[in-house]
Amino acid sequence: MGRFLKTAVDALKVFILFTGFTALFYYAMIWVNQEYENYHRYDKPEGSAVKVVEMDQDEKGGWFDRLIFFYQNGE
């Protein structure tokens, strides 16, 4: 009977630890979600930002030339 009781207590400890860490992980994920919920990554930059890429519309050729360029240079 003593061995069964010790095993049951150990199983209860594992269950309590698992439940506690699961709840901790759940609330941590909620906290991270709330932190980044109002984070606007695509706002227009402020200050002296410089546009790096500008699509050149004067260039002759079409989607096929761009596809070949992609296959040759990778990306």
UniProtKB/Swiss-Prot annotation:
Topology versus the membrane: Single-pass membrane protein
Keyword set includes Membrane: yes
UniProt cross-references to InterPro entries, sorted A to Z: DUF4227 (IPR025321)
Pfam families listed in its UniProt record: DUF4227
Compartments, record wording: Cell membrane
Protein keywords: Cell membrane, Membrane, Transmembrane, Transmembrane helix
Segments crossing the lipid bilayer: 12-32
GO CC annotation: plasma membrane
Protein name per Swiss-Prot or TrEMBL: Uncharacterized membrane protein YqzK
